[in-house]
Amino acid sequence: MITIYKNQLNEIALTNDIFRRDINLLYRFRFYYPTRKITKEGNFKTIEYFYKWTKFTINETLNEFLLLGDIDLLQSNSQWEFTVEYFDVGLNQWLDAYSDLVTIN
C-alpha cells in the first residue's frame, strides 16, 4: 500500500516542467502494470493491471497534505508505469504530460 500526496505530483511537475500555469486545467494520473500469464496452451497472455484515473486541478494541489488516495499495488518489488495527463479543451481530449516507471518495494 502506498500513499500519493499532491505535493509529490507538484515535485514531479517542477522537475519535469509538465504542469502549465492555468490553475484550472484538469489533470489525471494512474498507475499501470502489464504482466504476462502462461495459459493452458503454453502461450503467453498479457494481463493488464491498472488503477482508475484520479483527477485533480492545480488549485487542489496547493495543500501538500491533501491525499489523492491510498493505492494498493499488490505486488512488491515490481515496476509500475506512473502516468499524468492533462485535458486539452481545444482538442477535447486527454494528452500525455508525464510518464515514468516507479519501483514499488
Predicted regions and their residues:
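Contiguous beta-strand segments within globular domains
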Residues: M1-N24
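A short, compositionally biased N-terminal segment around positions ~18-40 that is enriched
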Residues: F19-E41
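Short, aromatic- and glycine-rich surface loops/edge beta-strands on solvent-exposed regions
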Residues: Y27-R30, I71-G90
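Hydrophobic beta-strand residues in large extracellular and virion-surface proteins
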Residues: F29-F31, F56-I58, F82-V84, V102-I104
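Short, surface-exposed beta-strand/loop "edge" segments at domain boundaries and coil↔beta transitions
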Residues: R36-K40, N63-F65, G90-Q93
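Solvent-exposed serine/threonine-rich low-complexity stretches and specific carbohydrate-binding patches
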Residues: K37-E60
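Signal that preferentially marks extracellular ectodomain short beta-strand elements
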Residues: K55-S76
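Short beta-strand elements
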Residues: D88-N105
